[in-house]
C-alpha cells in the first residue's frame, strides 16, 4: 500500500498511467538514488516536457533522465498552401507588384492540447514544491498528480491537522482549481516510516527491532495484521515466528 510498499519507480509509472497523454505510451521507468530514468517512444517533442512535469510531482524524485526516450516525429513547419490560380487581369495603368518574398513567422506543428496539458501538469510540481517548503510536511511521503487544473494528493501524513494543511497549501498554488485528498491518509509515524527506503532501488526496507513480529510490522505498514503473509512470502520466510532483530525486510506494495 502506498506510500510504504511501492518503490519510487512504481509510483512514477502510476503517475504516467494516470495521465491521458502518457498512459498509452508504455514508458519504462527505473530509479536509483533519486534519479529516474525513463525509456520508450513518444510522438512529439512536447511530450518530453510532459514526462518531466509528471515525474517531477513524485516524492523522492531528484533528477529525471529522458535520454532514453525517442521522439518519433520531430516538429516541423507545415507545407505552405498554394493559392488557387485565377486568370490574370491586365491593366495598362497598374504597375506590376514587386516579387520580393514576404518573410513569414515559423510555425511549429503540435497536437491539439499538448502545450496546455504540459503547462497544467507543471502545477503538480509547484504544489509538491509548496509542500516540501513547509516545515510540518517537508518529510511526509506525499505525491502530487495532475488532472486538468486539479491536483490529486497521494500518500500519508501524521495527523488530521497535517491533512488539512496539505490541502490548504495545494489550494493556495496559482492555477489549482481543485484538490482531491481521498488518496492521502493519516498514518501515525508516517515520516519515520517513509525513511525506511533502499537508496539504490527506492524500495521500502524495514529493520526488525526487538519485540517485533510480522503481524505487528504488517499492522504498522498496512493497518492489517493479517497482511503478515504478504511480507513473509516476499522475503522467503517459511516460519513467520522466526525473525531476528537487525534483519532487513522488504515491504511489498
UniProtKB/Swiss-Prot annotation:
The keyword Cytoplasm does not apply. PROSITE patterns: BON, LYSM. The keyword Transmembrane does not apply. This is Uncharacterized protein DR_0888. SMART domains: BON, LysM. CDD domains: LysM. Residues 79-105 are annotated as: Disordered. Residues 204-251 form the LysM domain. It comes from the Bacteria. Residues 4-73, 119-188 form the BON domain.
